[in-house]
Amino acid sequence: MSFYESVFIVRQDVSLNDIDKIVDDFSKIIKDNNGAIVKKEYWGLRALAYKIGNHKKGHYYLLGLDTTPAVKQELERKMKLNENIIRFLTQKVDSISNEPSPILKNQSTENTPVIDVTAN
């Protein structure tokens, strides 16, 4: 078994419930083939770096996988066939960290209010 990180972008008009169904379908494929999802991160609705088709925004999702290359290929095939997924990228990695990804860390610090302690 190998470790993979897969990031996919779902169309902006898809609901969070539908995104959860997509992730559940991917989880089922992996678990049915003796693999495991080690990490799941929803990065939120973000602006795309460039327009893809008619899309300017998308829901970003990261999956950390422990599976075989054949199952990874099947997962990528399902991503290609899913009309709600506008882009995806899967990379082989040496290990999957339990820490939040840098994007998720940055997102959580952006949402944290800054308190000015110098003002009296």
Curated annotation (Swiss-Prot):
Gene3D superfamilies: 3.30.70.60. Residues 97-120 are annotated as: Disordered. Keywords: Ribonucleoprotein, Ribosomal protein, RNA-binding, rRNA-binding. One of its GO terms (biological process) is translation. Residues 97-112 have a biased composition (Polar residues). GO terms for cellular component: cytoplasm; ribonucleoprotein complex; ribosome. The keyword Secreted does not apply. GO terms for molecular function: small ribosomal subunit rRNA binding; structural constituent of ribosome. The keyword NADP does not apply. Binds together with bS18 to 16S ribosomal RNA. HAMAP family: Ribosomal_bS6. Belongs to the bacterial ribosomal protein bS6 family. This is Small ribosomal subunit protein bS6.
